[in-house]
């Protein structure tokens, strides 16, 4: 019996444990980057590289940072659709017509129409044969520097997206406990080769149930964002995408602190 462990892209489940908290971190960080960027009067472009080789769920979650006063990220690029460098530059120029700065969210796995990754470094395969990507943000930073006379920087969120326990989603924590408990229950009942999964009932109010699913249908399969949740211009997500994501980041977790820092479980056995 399995209990999920993945950032997001497992098939046959609405989402996986940890995704809501990672999405909350991405959106919060994007809002904080926006605040820092707005301080300066110099026109600028900020490119934020977010995890996502084949699926752009975490990058899409950056849309949750938008509020009444901040439209950032102004542009969102996902690996589910082809990326065009010329159109990227035009998109930036269009935003600059009405905004002093442009904040871009980009998945590490974006690629051109021929399937080539937009990455400043060669892709190295991990033990599963999946490309380990890095440098996408830097590649786009160089592109903007070459094509435009404007201040530009790139930011790679990297492992922070999956280890920022200080900003966990209460919804995510509750679901994670429930999934683990269900997995133990399935094992006690003699079930095998199954995994506990989340099935969404509704968005508003957000309701869900847990059901077992055959692991053979899930293993090594990636669940990508529906194309209808990506705008025709391929540079943003739709309101349906936001409505899907929003419930997953709701709620906060109270942490205990010691000497000014969060107290986490000791990991002596890993050292």
Model-predicted segments: where are they?
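Accessory alpha-helical/coil subdomains and C-terminal extensions
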Residues: 17-153
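C-terminal non-catalytic interaction/assembly regions of soluble proteins
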Residues: 117-271
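Short, small-residue-biased leader/transition segments that mark boundaries at the very start
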Residues: 1-7
């Amino acid at each position: 019996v399995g209990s999920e462990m993945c950032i997001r892209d497992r098939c046959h489940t609405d989402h996986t444990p940890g995704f809501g908290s990672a999405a909350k971190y991405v959106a919060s960080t994007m809002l904080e980057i926006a605040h820092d960027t707005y301080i300066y009067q110099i026109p600028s472009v900020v490119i934020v590289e977010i995890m996502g080789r084949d699926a752009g769920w975490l990058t899409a979650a950056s849309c949750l940072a938008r509020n009444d006063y901040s439209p950032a990220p102004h542009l969102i690029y996902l690996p589910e659709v082809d990326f065009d460098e010329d159109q990227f530059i035009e998109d930036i120029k269009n935003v600059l017509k009405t905004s002093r700065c442009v904040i871009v969210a980009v998945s590490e796995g974006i690629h051109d129409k021929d399937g080539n990754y937009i990455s400043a470094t060669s892709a190295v395969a991990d033990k599963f044969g999946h490309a380990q990507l890095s440098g996408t943000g830097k590649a786009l930073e160089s592109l903007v520097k070459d094509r435009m006379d404007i201040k530009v920087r790139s930011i790679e969120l990297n492992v922070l997206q999956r280890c920022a326990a200080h900003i966990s989603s209460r919804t995510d924590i509750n679901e994670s406990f429930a999934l683990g408990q269900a997995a133990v229950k399935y094992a006690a009942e003699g079930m095998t080769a199954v995994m506990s999964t989340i099935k969404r009932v509704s968005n508003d109010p957000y309701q869900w149930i847990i059901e077992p699913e055959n692991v053979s249908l899930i293993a090594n399969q990636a669940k990508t964002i529906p194309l209808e949740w990506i705008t025709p211009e391929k540079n943003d997500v739709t309101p349906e995408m936001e409505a899907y994501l929003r419930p997953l980041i709701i709620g906060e977790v109270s942490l205990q602190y010691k000497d000014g820092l969060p107290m986490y479980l000791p990991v002596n056995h890993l050292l």
